[in-house]
Amino acid sequence: MIIKILGSGCANCKRLQAVTEEVIKVMGVDATIEKVEDIKMIMGYGVMRTPAIVINEKVKAFGRIPGKDEIKKYIQEEAKKEWGVV
């Protein structure tokens, strides 16, 4: 599973990355987190406000920091599609 954090490196972007890393660790999910700071790449996802979280190339949230439970739900949705598990 590939999780991308889109943003300029601002405090909210760093917070989203930290929260996402924490959720992954607690869930025990095999995932890679990538930071995307290039504005053209960010706009390529249709994101106009950061931070944003993209899981397996699907934008899940942008313009805010989702809570841990919300991030967990996004990961579970994609894990089910990818591996057939929750």
Spans of model-derived segments:
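Compositionally biased, disordered extreme N-termini, encompassing classical targeting presequences
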Residues: 1-2, 30, 76-86
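Local sequence-structure signature of Cys/Sec-based thiol-disulfide redox active-site neighborhoods
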Residues: 1-19
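Immediate flanking context of iron-sulfur cluster ligation sites
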Residues: 2-5, 33, 44
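Auxiliary Fe-S-binding modules of radical SAM enzymes
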Residues: 12, 43-45
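Conserved helix-turn-beta segment immediately C-terminal to the redox Cys motif
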Residues: 19-32
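Thiol-based oxidoreductase modules, predominantly thioredoxin-like and allied folds used
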Residues: 29-41
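Structural micro-motif
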Residues: 46-54
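Non-catalytic, surface beta->alpha helical segment in thiol-disulfide oxidoreductase systems
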Residues: 57-83
